[in-house]
Amino acid sequence: MSWDDEDFDIPSNSKQAAASWEEEGNDEPLLDSWDIDEEEVARKKKEEEAKKKAEKEALKKKQEESKAKKLSKNKGQRALLDIDLVDENTRQELLKKAELDADLNNAADLFGGLGVAGEGGMDINEHPRERAAKAAAAAAAASGPTPARLTKDTPIDTHPLFQPTDRQEYEKLRKALAPVLTNLAEDSLMNYSSGLAIDLIRDLAQPLSIESIRKVVSTLNVISKEKEKAERQARLKKAGGTATGGAGKKKAKPAVKTNVNTSFKQDVFDDIDQSKYDEFEEDDFM
């Protein structure tokens, strides 16, 4: 048997080897030097945003400090103007107070930014006046809401007393207003009656119904009768009358004598001589 007569192919591994190298290379692609990591980009972006935010906050804080200094300076100028208008003793006291405030401001500016806390967690960076204002606000909050104060320029309807919601609050409003308004009559009764009371009653009665207005009229009639009675009693008392409205004391009538002696008349008739009149008869008078 000859080796030359047989045909057979020798398997070649070159293609398989090449394919295996290509597959192995595709499994884990290598990053080139110019490729950028996404996590790194996100981290740098966050750092830039944080930096910008910090710069904005620092700028805002600086503007607020500048504004506060300007306001403080203006207050100091107003204080100096006020100092010039007072007497010497008060002027010296105000000057000392202004110097103390200036020293406190300088100390606050000097220690600003140190971030040092004092005893009890107190921040020494905080201005003493600001600390005092906070303490006053805390004390006011602890003691409850302060009552509203009215001035000539304050709208009266903003006061809580003028915002009633039920019958009790309306009665409270009436009891508060009545003595204040009626006391004005002591200062000027003419202005009170012509400029306030009469017109106020009319204005208050405008929204009422007819039945309610009749009740108002009836109430005023009762007051009017009581006033008339009081004035009449005062006049009678002044003229010497009684307190109950009677006339003055009347003069006593002379007493009637009931025990008159009638025997005197009978004795007179008995002493007359009637015989003298016997000669006259009835015919004589015809």
Swiss-Prot record:
What Pfam families has UniProt attached to this entry? eIF3_subunit
Q: What is its main location?
A: cytoplasm
Database matches in InterPro entries: eIF3-like_dom_sf (IPR023194), eIF3j (IPR013906)
Localization, per the record, is: Cytoplasm
GO biological process terms on file? formation of cytoplasmic translation initiation complex; maturation of SSU-rRNA from tricistronic rRNA transcript (SSU-rRNA, 5.8S rRNA, LSU-rRNA); nuclear-transcribed mRNA catabolic process, nonsense-mediated decay
The molecular function GO annotations come to:
translation initiation factor activity
Where does it sit, as one GO cellular component term? eukaryotic translation initiation factor 3 complex
Q: Which UniProt keywords apply?
A: Coiled coil, Cytoplasm, Initiation factor, Protein biosynthesis
Q: Where is the composition biased (Acidic residues)?
A: 21-35
Location of the region described as Disordered in the Swiss-Prot/TrEMBL record = 1-35, 141-162, 229-258
Coiled coil start-end: 35-75
Function recorded in the entry: Component of the eukaryotic translation initiation factor 3 (eIF-3) complex, which is involved in protein synthesis of a specialized repertoire of mRNAs and, together with other initiation factors, stimulates binding of mRNA and methionyl-tRNAi to the 40S ribosome. The eIF-3 complex specifically targets and initiates translation of a subset of mRNAs involved in cell proliferation.
Q: According to its UniProt record, which protein family does this protein belong to?
A: Belongs to the eIF-3 subunit J family.
- Assembly description: Component of the eukaryotic translation initiation factor 3 (eIF-3) complex.
HAMAP family per the UniProt record, alphabetical: eIF3j (MF_03009)
Name of the protein described by the UniProt record: Eukaryotic translation initiation factor 3 subunit J
